[in-house]
């Protein structure tokens, strides 16, 4: 199966996804990104800790075989392979390592922890189990913990050290290894009087595995939205094998065979039974039913459908059997496009993450340096400056008894070397680069998933961050603030030509156009039962009009300036109506007056944005009087309207606003909005808009409702707030806990951490970040329930 390669507009530039197993912290991410960026031909790299994917942009002329990328990654000690399918509907949710295996490791570690603890409890209760109070017994337990449930962690840590890319596992290896080696020395040479740390490796690995198992479950839950989307695609369907030989009226009862959905092709006929999801985008050729389209469109009520209607993959057939001719299958369906957009959004990093990445890239080196300094300081200067710390007990340590058993008492004094070793180990295991690495991607993962559930497709975490900072919203008029369903209310002839012929010419020039004004002219011609005529040499100029030849006449249809006909005075119409002018080479021929209605939710959306301190403007290519009339209907002042603007001038207007320091969001739907959408800090396109507008936008509102703008803005602000909370926690945790573990509070307050407690703190830290990101689901849904419905 070919690798999932996506070619960009640049023929020499290629993007590919690489699955990377074994990454545990931000240090792992930084190591992979650094190694790939050093590879000749690689242009850009983005590695996601949550999805365990690396997106690599590279020059295909310099890298002919992309497996060289996986070779570079495996050289760091990680397992890597190219993603082998570009159909997002067939891709499993990353779950590495499997939760089942991790739970087994946790169960073994918990058993060892209980057995180890029982020796202490039995000693306290004066009823120890035979042998459990012996240090050799605990030495064997520690070996079992290290080589059993802890083996994968220690192996990954050693690989990181060996390859020059130390990570979280490397810190655990150094901490547990140091504790165990020191304990062996104490066990083999009891005359040294050293304390044994034999319970520390067991407790430390138990806490770490508990934290990672809970963290893995939380990660899996954070991908719930993507899982829900994937679940909309059935695996099999009923395929009609020879539909051409079956009469149309017999298609519903024709025999069918079970067929894998992944093997369907355009032109296939499928039967869809009641209670089954539709597997393809296509057209109904037999039957009528009702469909549940809520997951894709947000429409809560079942929608009737009949022969000739188009349906989308993932919608649920509710009542009767249907036969559908497939038009788009697999990766070409609308559902696949949504899943792909969500997956790509989760892969793209928010700018705020660069700060965490900059720290995490050298975090492990810094921790190792702090641990070394801690050991050196307390072994020499610290114990001399504050000798009283040597008289303080070190809680949780096992000490030698003369009979090679163990006690839970503490010696009255410790050697400086013992104190230094204890604190250095605590520094190694308390540090948490995991929290830094998880702070941003977990929040983005949850936020983009929530957005998808609301029919909002976000291009990436960077778009969410930009949207959260937006305070200036600019709306296109036609099809955005209005319904885009124009009605021709008047034909005003300006020359001696039959009005029906004028309408035929206008409809011919606008044939095949999706613009709302064009649709209105075509609909009016059909309603008048006018025979369609052909137009040749048609040429569309976005935002201005269209030209062509009809009945031997060279015609232009569009705004009066563009049709370039000198006239003393243009006729006037309704202030709220939109005009389209038809002219030939000599004169104006007609003016078509069309009227549109505002979207029902437009006024409330505009007022809701303004009530939250946002500035709202209208930017339109329509007449000034028409745009101002709409603004007044929406409660906006005439000063907020900029009308009669060409497409390139729209982009210039957005650029001018942003040059004043304002981050601007542009909401539009047409071809003429594409330059402005691309220029704005955040471009927002409605689903009914043109393909060019959708491609230029960072946000796509698939439910084609303006209130989705409010939902997206609210979600982006909540998501950014969650990211900041996560980063504050991750940084604050390390800023506080590293000095505490290093003994900074030991002389004055007698506060320090044992390695086991340090390991527990580390596990709790990363779990707190993931849990806080999951809370975003709760707070967002609560905000939806308490927000004003528009």
Curated annotation (Swiss-Prot):
Any single Gene Ontology cellular-component annotation: plasma membrane
GO biological process, one term: copper ion homeostasis
Membership in a protein family: Belongs to the cation transport ATPase (P-type) (TC 3.A.3) family. Type IB subfamily.
Residue positions binding Cu cation: 25, 28
Subcellular location: Cell membrane
Enzyme active site: 476
Positions in the Cytoplasmic compartment: 1-105, 155-166, 212-357, 440-726, 777-790
Task of the protein: Involved in copper transport.
Database matches in NCBIfam families: ATPase-IB_hvy, ATPase_P-type
Keyword vocabulary terms for this entry: ATP-binding, Cell membrane, Copper, Copper transport, Ion transport, Magnesium, Membrane, Metal-binding, Nucleotide-binding, Phosphoprotein, Translocase, Transmembrane, Transmembrane helix, Transport
Secretion signal span: none
Reaction equations catalysed: Cu(2+)(in) + ATP + H2O = Cu(2+)(out) + ADP + phosphate + H(+)
Chain ranges on the Extracellular side, renumbered to this chain: 126-134, 190-193, 381-416, 750-753
TM spans (from-to): 106-125, 135-154, 167-189, 194-211, 358-380, 417-439, 727-749, 754-776
GO molecular function: ATP binding; ATP hydrolysis activity; copper ion binding; P-type divalent copper transporter activity
Topological relation to the membrane, as annotated: Multi-pass membrane protein
Domain HMA: 14-81
Keyword Cell inner membrane applies: no
Domain of life from the UniProt record: Bacteria
PROSITE patterns: ATPASE_E1_E2, HMA_1, HMA_2
Binding-site positions, Mg(2+): 669, 673
Full protein name: Probable copper-transporting ATPase SynA
């Amino acid at each position: 199966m070919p690798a999932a390669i996506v070619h960009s507009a640049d023929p020499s530039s290629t993007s590919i996804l690489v699955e990377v197993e074994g990454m545990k912290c931000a240090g792992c991410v930084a190591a992979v990104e650094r190694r790939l960026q050093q590879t000749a031909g690689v242009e850009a790299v983005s590695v996601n800790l949550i999805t365990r994917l690396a997106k690599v942009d590279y020059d295909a002329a310099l890298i002919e075989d992309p497996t060289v990328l996986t070779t570079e990654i495996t050289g760091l000690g990680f397992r890597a392979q190219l993603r082998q399918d570009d159909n997002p509907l067939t891709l499993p949710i990353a779950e590495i390592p499997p939760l089942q295996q991790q739970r087994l490791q946790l169960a073994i570690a918990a058993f060892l922890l209980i057995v180890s603890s029982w020796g202490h409890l039995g000693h306290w209760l004066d009823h120890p189990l035979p042998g459990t109070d012996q240090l050799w017994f605990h030495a064997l337990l520690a070996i079992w913990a290290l080589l059993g449930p802890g083996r994968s962690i220690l192996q990954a840590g050693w690989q990181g050290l060996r390859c020059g890319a130390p990570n979280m596992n490397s810190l655990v290896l150094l901490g547990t290894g140091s504790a165990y080696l020191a304990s062996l020395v104490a066990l083999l040479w009891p005359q040294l009087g050293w304390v044994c740390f034999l319970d520390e490796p067991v407790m430390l690995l138990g806490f770490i595995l508990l934290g990672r198992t809970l963290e893995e479950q939380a990660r899996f839950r954070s991908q719930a939205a993507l899982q829900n989307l994937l679940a909309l695609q059935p695996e099999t369907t009923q395929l009609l094998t020879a539909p051409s030989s079956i009469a149309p009226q017999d298609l519903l009862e024709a025999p069918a065979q079970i067929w894998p959905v992944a093997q369907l092709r355009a032109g296939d006929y499928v039967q869809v039974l009641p209670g089954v999801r539709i597997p393809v985008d296509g057209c109904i050729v037999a039957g009528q039913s009702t469909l549940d389209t809520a997951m894709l469109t947000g429409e809560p009520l079942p929608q009737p459908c009949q022969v000739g209607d188009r349906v989308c993959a993932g919608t649920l057939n509710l009542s009767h059997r249907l036969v559908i001719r497939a038009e788009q299958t697999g990766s070409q369906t609308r559902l696949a496009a949504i899943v792909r957009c969500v997956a790509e959004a989760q892969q793209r990093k928010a700018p705020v993450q660069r700060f965490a990445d900059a720290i995490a890239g050298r975090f492990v080196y810094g921790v190792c340096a702090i641990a070394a300094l801690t050991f050196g300081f307390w072994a020499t200067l610290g114990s001399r400056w504050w000798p009283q710390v040597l008289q303080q007990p070190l809680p949780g340590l096992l000490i030698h008894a003369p009979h090679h058993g163990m006690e839970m008492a503490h010696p009255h004094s410790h050697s400086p070397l013992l104190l230094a070793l204890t604190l250095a180990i605590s520094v190694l295991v308390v540090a948490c680069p995991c929290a830094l690495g998880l702070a941003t991607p977990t929040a983005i993962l949850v936020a983009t998933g929530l957005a998808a559930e609301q029919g909002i497709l976000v291009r990436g975490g960077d778009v969410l961050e930009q949207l959260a900072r937006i305070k200036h919203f600019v709306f296109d008029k036609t099809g955005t603030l209005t319904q885009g369903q124009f009605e021709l209310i008047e034909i005003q002839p300006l020359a001696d030509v039959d009005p029906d012929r004028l309408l035929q010419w206008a409809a011919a020039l606008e044939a095949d156009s999706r613009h709302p004004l064009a649709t209105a002219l075509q609909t009016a011609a059909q309603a008048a039962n006018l025979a369609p005529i052909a137009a040749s040499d048609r040429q569309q100029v976005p935002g201005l009009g269209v030209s062509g030849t009809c009945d031997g006449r060279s015609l232009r249809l569009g705004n009066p300036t563009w049709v370039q006909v000198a006239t003393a005075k243009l006729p006037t119409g309704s202030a709220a109506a939109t005009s389209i002018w038809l002219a030939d080479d000599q004169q104006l021929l007609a003016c078509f007056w069309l009227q549109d209605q505002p979207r029902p939710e437009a006024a409330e959306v505009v007022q809701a944005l303004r009530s939250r301190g946002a500035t709202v403007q209208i930017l339109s290519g329509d007449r000034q009087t028409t745009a101002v009339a709409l603004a007044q209907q929406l409660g906006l002042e005439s000063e907020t309207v900029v009308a009669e603007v060409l497409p390139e001038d729209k982009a210039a207007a957005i650029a001018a606003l942003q040059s004043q320091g304002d981050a601007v969001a542009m909401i539009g739907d047409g071809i003429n909005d594409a330059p402005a959408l691309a220029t704005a800090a955040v471009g927002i396109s409605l689903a009914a808009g043109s393909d060019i507008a959708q491609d230029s936008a960072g946000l796509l509102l698939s439910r084609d409702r303006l209130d989705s703008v409010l939902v997206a803005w609210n979600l982006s602000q909540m998501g950014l707030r969650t990211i900041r909370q996560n980063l504050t926690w991750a940084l604050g945790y390390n800023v506080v806990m590293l000095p505490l573990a290093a003994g900074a509070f030991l002389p004055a307050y007698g506060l320090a951490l044992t390695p086991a407690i340090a390991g527990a703190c580390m596990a709790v830290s990363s779990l707190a970040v993931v849990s806080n990101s999951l809370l975003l689901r709760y707070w967002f849904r609560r905000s939806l329930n308490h927000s004003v419905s528009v």
